Amino acid sequence: LSKGDFTHTPELYLADEAMMRGETAFTPRQLTDLNPWFAGMLSEPRELWMDTLDGESRVQGFVFPPQGMEEGKKYPAVVYIHGGPTPFIGAALTYEHQCILGAGMGLIVMNFRGSSGYGEAHQSMTRAYDGGAMTDILQFTDLAVRECPWMDGERLGVTGGSFGGYMTNWICGHTKRFKAAVTQRSIANELIQYASSDMAGSSKDYADFSDFMMEQLKKSPVSYAEKIDIPFLILHGMNDMRCPVEHAHQLFSAVRETHPDLPVKMILFPGMTHSFPMGGPIDLRIAHYDAMIGWFKKYL
């Protein structure tokens, strides 16, 4: 079997049949140790739980201190919102997270409502889009600041890709909690998703098509672009079929027009699809991470 965690790449282990059936203690023998060179280099997270404000669920999350943190020193932190929204943050090494941590910033991740792994009610897509996810993200962020003396609650950034990008856009248009943002392969206009995404939507639940159109605009972060007033970086692959690159163009134009003096930048990556930067040419992946980390280091 293969096993890894937040600070270890997957390694091969050998377990006998009795262990697998639960008849004896589960103590598999490790067969490989492929990356001993970074032992102790990576940041270990602290697990936190909270009851949601409405009392309907509990949210699990993890807070990572910066690599090489010095006692008594304050550090900025980045809230990283996962995509989906149905995936979840589990005990696996994520190099994107560790890149941020290696740049002198902390990291906050959580499994807000819409995430899988905590039952059907918690996973509800309705709760992901009706304000439940945003409330959970902000509440967990406040919890992390209270619980971590090293974290500077006035120097927080926010980022995410796909649904995480949508939520980054939405939060920045509805709160003043963060000092800088990086939105990745995001959704800005739900009408683009309806018409152009490879997961195109449908108006079949609406009796009046104009009502459907207006509802999509209400749910679209671009409609609230004038409320985005923090340094804002947009990263997007030009061949993204899930969240077409038109999202990036519309959001960039709207934020720049409504805030001419605001630091806002768009970087497009030729040929890259929705799986970028998890996959793709290494030079473009490095450029993506350099842009994201550089933005936060400059503005946090």
Spans of model-derived segments:
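Short loop/turn segments at connectors of secondary-structure elements within structured domains
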Residues: 6-9, 71-73, 116, 260
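Short regulatory "switch" loops immediately downstream of catalytic or recognition motifs
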Residues: 15-20, 66-67, 254-257
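Cap/lid segment of the alpha/beta-hydrolase catalytic domain
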Residues: 21-154, 159-161, 193-200
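Active-site-proximal cap/loop segments of hydrolase catalytic domains
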Residues: 112-300
